[in-house]
């Protein structure tokens, strides 16, 4: 709604093209938010064969003002094409380019809200002990959480939980930024090896004089993800893979061990 509200105000606005890359979830959300709106064209890039059939159907079957393009590559390749388009000033002006990816700050502003909502659901005495484990791919969600903390939300600590695409955990562990080829995993919305929000994360830590070493992290493989999903089901919670990864990382944070982990089955 935050993205689409301005386009609902008038059918006389200049035409806008929403160019978005998706690793699975964003595509459907964007397509349904803008579907049928006047003067708005949506172009969604996604990695061919690397999202689930259900996710693909959710945004590839609408037609109308929603166009989809399957890219022979991974999400990082899709994201690179979006960045390339936004670097072309003539193209931006001609098409009225905008985006629903986190390259657009309004995406993060909306995500800030549910951190406050989550904290509000806790008893007052528990809020200063809040540790949030964030399933992370492109790291926009974690960036939003850090922005919430910078606005005064009393979050004690964050945990960045990734799948096998572990560029950030390896960087935090060894100090070397060394992206590898993106791996397809059960948690496909997190299949990102070059998260473009990571510079924002580092900048927030720098500006707020927070120590990056306080950021917890865990890289969780598919077998461990499956085990976490089974454990959650056994206690009455039906989870999808992304949340299961975050839960596993949070569970590890409660054990008396070092604050950073790499899990194995």
What are these regions (language model features)?
Residues 3-10:
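Short, small-residue-biased leader/transition segments that mark boundaries at the very start
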Residues 13-16, 37-42, 63-66, 93-94, ...:
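Short coil/turn connectors at secondary-structure junctions
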Residues 13-30, 42-44, 128-138, 259-264:
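A short, small-residue-rich loop immediately preceding and capping a beta-strand
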Residues 17-53, 58-59, 65:
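Glycine-rich, mobile lid/loop segments that gate access to catalytic sites or pores
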Residues 19-32, 52-53, 136-145, 168, ...:
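Short glycine/serine/threonine-rich phosphate/pyrophosphate-binding segments
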Residues 55-103, 107, 159-245, 249:
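Active-site/ligand-binding loops adjacent to catalytic centers
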Residues 80, 84, 89, 93-148, ...:
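Domain-scale recognition of functional cores that engage charged ligands
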Residues 247-265:
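C-terminal non-catalytic interaction/assembly regions of soluble proteins
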């Amino acid at each position: 709604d935050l993205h689409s509200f301005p386009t609902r105000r008038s059918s006389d606005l200049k035409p806008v093209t929403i160019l978005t890359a998706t690793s699975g979830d964003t595509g459907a959300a964007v397509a349904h938010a803008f579907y049928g709106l006047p003067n708005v064209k949506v172009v969604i890039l996604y990695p061919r064969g690397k999202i689930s059939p259900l996710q693909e159907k959710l945004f590839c079957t609408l037609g109308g003002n929603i166009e989809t393009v399957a890219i022979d590559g991974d999400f990082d390749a899709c994201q690179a094409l979006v960045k390339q388009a936004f670097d072309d000033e003539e193209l931006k002006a001609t098409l009225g380019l905008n985006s629903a990816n986190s390259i657009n700050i309004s995406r993060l502003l909306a995500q800030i809200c549910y951190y406050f909502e989550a904290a509000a659901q806790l008893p007052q005495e528990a809020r200063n002990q809040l540790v949030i484990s964030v399933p992370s791919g492109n790291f926009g969600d974690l960036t939003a959480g850090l922005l919430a903390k910078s606005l005064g939300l009393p979050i004690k600590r964050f945990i960045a939980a990734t799948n096998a695409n572990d560029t950030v955990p390896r960087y935090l562990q060894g100090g070397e930024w060394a992206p590898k080829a993106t791996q397809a995993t059960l948690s496909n919305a997190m299949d990102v090896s070059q998260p473009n929000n990571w510079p924002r994360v580092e900048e927030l830590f720098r500006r707020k004089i927070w120590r990056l070493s306080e950021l917890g992290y865990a890289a969780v493989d598919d077998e461990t993800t499956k085990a976490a999903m089974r454990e959650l089901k056994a206690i009455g919670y039906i989870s999808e893979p992304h949340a299961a990864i975050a839960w596993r990382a949070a569970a590890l944070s409660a054990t008396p061990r070092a604050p950073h982990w790499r899990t194995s089955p």
